Amino acid sequence: LRCLVGSEMCIRDRTITGVGHSSHDEVWTAPWGENKRHRNRYNEMSVSVRKPDKSMAFTLRFRAFDDGIAFRYELAQPDSLAVTDELTEFRFANEGHTMSWSIPGNFETYELQYREQPVARITDANTPFTFRTGDGIFGAVHEAALYDWPEMVLRRDSAGVLQADLAPLPDGVKAYIPGRFTTPWRTIQIADRAVGLINSSLVLNLNEPSKIEDPSWIVPQKDVGVWWGMHLGTQVWTMGPRHGATTRNAIRHIDFAAENGIQGVLFEGWNKGWENWGGNQQFDYLEPYADFDLERIAAYAREKGVQLWMHNETGGNILSTKPSWKQR
């Protein structure tokens, strides 16, 4: 467990100034989700560390749950910092006999095909990085409480070890943080069966509680949509013979949603501007393509009791949205 602040190793030449232990056990209720009640039970150890000249101090906090472990840094020093790397490593005892399921490490997308292969063959992976040991134990490497910090992917280093790799800023620095700062949790979930990973509340328990005092106005819903066909290559975003967001296709999806108790239909590629993808990224957020009759589709959806969810892409050009929003 290491990190770099500038060119300085966080834990090199440091002195442990204190070790604390505590336990916690509570049950909390979620307003919605797969499970209503979540048990948050863990044993905790905090290790306080300081440089001899007292210029850098931080705490390493570890938590052991019934179904996994987690750890993070809590920094406390007077000046802001430029974090250049995080060198947290994840080592597997027998990589050749430990199977994994993951997508390739990518800072821009999670819409990739999952791979099933031994850990020994992994060069990079997004998290959650799911694995099964040779003796049948399931696990997953992930993160929790990710605030004001880059996402983590796993990448094999020159020593052959899977190491945390953080998405960089344009200048190459990983994060600019205030002197008092808490990093995300690094998590490892453990289960006898794969379903135990899905049912685990470990990551939820480590995230901050919701700051929404009254969530009654938020209504979870299911949707079907015109978008995945583009990623599969069977449809395209732009108008033409293979256009996905057409009036005919919209009606078909609305009928399916109404017949199966699905509340909404999502449309991607319905508005003009997708032909600019990869160029100036200028989208029109009010004008549909000619083969997408928005008024007819909206009236039909209203008749069927189905909501329309319109995807408005920016392509990273967030400023292009402002003129359109002013027209609404």
Where do the PLM segments sit?
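Residues within well-ordered beta-strands of beta-sheet-rich folds
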Residues: 70-74, 188, 307
